[in-house]
Amino acid sequence: MSDTGALHESWATLWEAIADAQPDALAVVIGTQEMTWREYDDRAARLAGAFTAAGVGRGTKVAQLMFNCPEYMESVYAAFKVQASPVNVNYRYQAAEIAYVCDNAGAEVLVFHGAHADRVATARADGLMPSVRLLLQVDDGHSLIDGARWYHDVIAEAEPAPRIDRSGDDELLLYTGGTTGMPKGVIWPHHELFGALAFPGYMAAGLDVPTTIDAVAGTAAAIRGSGHSPVMLCAPPLMHGTALFLAMSAFVMGGTVVLLGGRSFDADELWDLVERYQVTQISLVGDAFARPMTAALAARAEAGSPRNLASLQRIASTGATLSADQKRALAAHAPNLMILDMIGASEGGPFGVSATMPGDEPTDTAVFTAPPNVVTLDPDTHEVIPRGSDTPGMLAVSGPMPAGYLGDPDKTARTFPVIDGVRYTVPGDFATIATDGTVTLLGRGSVCINSGGEKIYPEEVEVAAREHPDVIDAIAVGVPHERFGQTVTLVCSTRAPVDPDAIIDTVKERIAHYKAPRQIVFVDEVYRAPNGKLDYRWATDTAIAALAGS
């Protein structure tokens, strides 16, 4: 991957250049609500003015506890304007968890929807968020809690903050949702994040990465002039890096970010927005999003009113792969569609890309192509494993990356090691890389199953199981076994009753027999986090409880 770190600027400065160049273009759409770049910049500037008046500035942490909404992006932009660091907080967290993130980050500002007000009030009453001194509540029909101010009143009363000189070393703090341990704050300097997002933005569009602010604005103007400005629909929550980062990538190219208006995923609303705003790209996370989307497309087609998806050029799935049947179903309704599976992490990437072009037959979704700066490392020695080796190693990528984890130098040293003078990001996924760059993803080392001394990576079992036509979703875990230490157990949901042996046979047809599940636990729905990622702790608990009762 080419060096994309030459532009050493704040994201606020970049977005201001875009706003000046195209003030009347659409910046944000949520449901039927529209906001131009002029409005977006003005509202963010007024909130930044309120921040400045409250003593919020460089390095201050500004936490967001919100559903997808314009206020989310406004508060991120406003924080950037005053050189503060946005902090994402999972809106499903309970009071103690909200307090943990705010306290761990040292957040001084919390912007939140009224729907979360009771939990915020509980955390405050219990003295769990001592650093938070400014509460801004977004009005959604709930009463204002003690000590908070209405978000929109603050903006209406504030004067726009003047534009200032900023630094590419300003930071965004992204908390990982992970499936093990407490959330960790990943520190992303602005210039490093710009470099990392060059791949899904400029490079994916075949464009040179700008190296000056004028070039950023000029590139956006050229894209708009050609009629190809990106219109990015972010289906996952902005509280996760997948949606937020791709929204930022679309913004810096002068594009429009489209968000669903509802608070639960509605596939029909998504397709309405695609048609209404001529959406060009959709960001999602695996089959958890794709299955209701394809079901909605099929229902419309069967009713005699198929969707017009001529504008849709790309669907990108990060964090979970799309199954072959879902790729086929999407491609059947969108003639110009390119489908991308990307291996990424809060700590960086991409580590691999799987592209299904228009007319291609979808293949095994666990096979990707690694960019040149991606290697595998021996987990014990940290030596680079030559491409073409069958030895599994930890995926690692060099190039733009975070500064580390907030307040955790030991984990920073483990995840971002320097090897032979090169700094790598090593989030913990195991894989092999063939001579031609083909990546076979094996899964995360922390959830690797050890059965009789054999290492079994869940993802290869899950991908194989989903090839059974009646399997909707599946997650593989290891359950304790007296003789083998662990045995592979599959927790899965199906469209109809299925003989467990049929699923096991499907797996054995695709991978080594010893990797196949010894038992299967059927559930109505395989639980996934709001970002679409599988929850291995939930699956392990579910499997153990079901097997104990059988």
Predicted segments — roles?
Residues 53-54, 84-156, 165, 496:
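Structural core segment of the AMP-binding/adenylate-forming
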Residues 3, 7, 24-69, 73, ...:
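Conserved AMP-binding/adenylate-forming core of the ANL superfamily
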Residues 157-177, 181-182, 221-231:
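Conserved pre-ATP/AMP-binding loop-to-beta segment of ANL
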Residues 67, 112-121, 141, 236, ...:
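Adenylate-forming
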Residues 195-235, 239-283:
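Conserved AMP-binding/adenylation subdomain of ANL enzymes
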Residues 93, 99, 110-113, 393, ...:
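AMP-binding/adenylate-forming catalytic core of the ANL superfamily
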Residues 255, 313-439, 444-448, 461-462:
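Conserved AMP-binding/adenylate-forming
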Residues 36-38, 171-212:
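Conserved AMP-binding A3 loop
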